[in-house]
Amino acid sequence: MEIIQKIIKERTFIDPKDGKTKSRFGYRGHNQIAWIIVHYTGDYGSQGCAKKTADAMQTWKRTVSTHYLVGDDAIYQTVKDKHAAWHCPYEKSNKCAASNCVAIGVDLVERKRNPRSHSVKDRDWYFTDKVIQDGAQLVAMLADKYNIPQDHIVRHYDVTGKWCPRPFVGNDTNEITGDIHEIGWAMFKERVRLARRCPDDV
């Protein structure tokens, strides 16, 4: 599996809104990686292109980042595993113990049929088969590398209740795939399990 390294070089930036120094990622300290949290970018303009978001992360003045971006074009790593990306803050982690300091963030880069509407409730956010397949392979590889149990592979939604990744959240039907969103997540998790070294032991 080829992963393009596009590591964010400048950790800190000056927030133009308040003039304060802030960071794009942080340090884990003594915390061990124990979770993988799956997201989508929520950027209707990405249309499956991981490079666009990976490039933007290099300079944007936002306290938001992720370790990996999986797109139709390629897989990018933007934050080293040993560092904490800002993708799921602890103060919002009210459903399980996963958070930035103990998790790896994986963003699947979505497409949207109608980019004029940006609502998370829209049912036309979707992942291509390639993104799902490559994403499952990446998550399986990371889970095996860090000995992460299958039930510690979760959605952003499972941690905070935020509808992310939308193509895998909700009991409504996706307009593109025809699948119920929750079933899409179950199918993705099964792909991950089958791609692991010992699928029957996780």
Language-model features and meaning:
Residues 1-99:
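N-terminal catalytic cores of peptidoglycan-degrading enzymes
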Residues 38, 104, 153-155:
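Hydrophobic faces of well-ordered beta-strands that scaffold small-molecule active sites
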Residues 43, 102-104, 108-114:
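Short connector loops/turns at beta-strand edges and beta->alpha or beta->beta junctions
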Residues 1-14, 30, 97, 109-202:
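Basic/polar, cationic surfaces and motifs that engage anionic cell-wall
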